[in-house]
């Protein structure tokens, strides 16, 4: 299976690097500057499960300009860009989509599915989620900061197809956890509930989970935000499973936790955030079903003010 990984940042670099190190046929579609960096230094991953070095001479790299000049198609496109970069990413990898190409998006939220369906056709797009806390340093090295490193994927119509089994076989044994999910849409909603909750909690109160839990009213506020997000999912026909919701709630209300969500980390760095895709879209779907979420709305308003400030 020929795999095209879009970008070689924290998430794409981690999973693409793991796949390449395991001998899979992986090509990275990257910007010219990142290509130069990788050709010089290779791709290095620091991980609690053991560090990985993909030597520069073994890396297969393409730029968007090279792909447009000489189009070639791939069996699987692994897409893990930030949601706000989706439109430009689709334009970049469009020449790589052939009649049998599968696009596996590992983006946050759900709105990206509509955009991918419109551009390439729903038959090319499957559902996917990932749980990983990773970052990339100034030298382009990827750092995985917890033991989470899983990819879950599946068709959106609950059918286990031959192409899903082929993807499972390709990714299994590459150094991260792989799960072929039957009810993929439900799994995506489940992640969205907890991702939006954790992002809203940390960004609204500007602290790690542990710092929020230590503040007066922090636990109660966090639980109220989780309840709002779960209510929106339930109203849209995707009530979170009780066990999964309980586990997720424990994770984002853990006393002493050093967890900082990616959105909060981006906010602290003065970088762009995925507020529209993670919080705004969830609020819109809640409003359409008559569900009010005042704390989630406050978090979204705060992030909207922040986003406007970094543009000015």
Q: Which residues does each predicted region cover?
A:
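Internal alpha-helical scaffold of NAD(P)-dependent oxidoreductase catalytic cores
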Residues: 95-96, 118-126, 139-242
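NAD(P)-dependent Rossmann-like dehydrogenase/reductase catalytic/cofactor-binding core
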Residues: 169, 223-312
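Rossmann-like NAD(P)(H) cofactor-binding subdomain of soluble oxidoreductases
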Residues: 55-141
């Amino acid at each position: 299976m020929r795999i095209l990984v879009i970008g070689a940042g924290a998430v794409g670099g981690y999973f693409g690097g793991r796949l390449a190190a395991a001998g899979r046929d992986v090509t990275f579609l990257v910007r010219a500057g990142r290509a130069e960096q990788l050709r010089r230094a290779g791709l290095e991953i620091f991980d609690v499960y053991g560090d990985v070095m993909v030597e520069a001479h073994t890396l297969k790299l393409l730029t968007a300009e090279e792909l447009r000049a000489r189009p070639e198609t791939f069996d699987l496109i692994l897409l893990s860009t930030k949601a706000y970069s989706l439109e430009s990413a689709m334009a970049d990898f469009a020449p790589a989509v052939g009649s049998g190409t599968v696009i596996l998006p590992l983006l946050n939220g759900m709105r990206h599915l509509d955009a991918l369906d419109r551009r390439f056709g729903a038959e090319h797009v499957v559902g996917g989620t990932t749980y990983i806390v990773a970052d990339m340093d100034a030298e382009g090295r990827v750092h995985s900061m917890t033991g989470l490193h899983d990819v879950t994927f599946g068709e959106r119509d609950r059918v286990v197809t031959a192409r899903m089994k082929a993807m499972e076989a390709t990714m299994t044994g590459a150094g991260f956890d792989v799960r072929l999910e039957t009810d993929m849409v439900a799994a995506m909603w489940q992640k969205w509930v907890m991702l939006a909750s954790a992002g809203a909690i940390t960004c609204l109160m500007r602290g790690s989970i542990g710092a929020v839990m230590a503040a007066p009213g922090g636990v109660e506020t966090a639980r109220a935000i989780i309840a709002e997000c779960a209510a929106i999912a339930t109203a849209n026909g995707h009530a979170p499973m009780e066990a999964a919701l309980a586990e997720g709630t424990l994770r984002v209300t853990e006393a002493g936790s050093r967890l900082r969500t990616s959105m909060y980390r981006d906010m602290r760095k003065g970088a762009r955030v995925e507020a529209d895709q993670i919080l705004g879209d969830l609020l819109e779907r809640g409003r359409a079903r008559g569900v009010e979420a005042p704390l989630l709305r406050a978090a979204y308003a705060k992030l909207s003010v922040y986003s406007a400030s970094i543009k000015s």
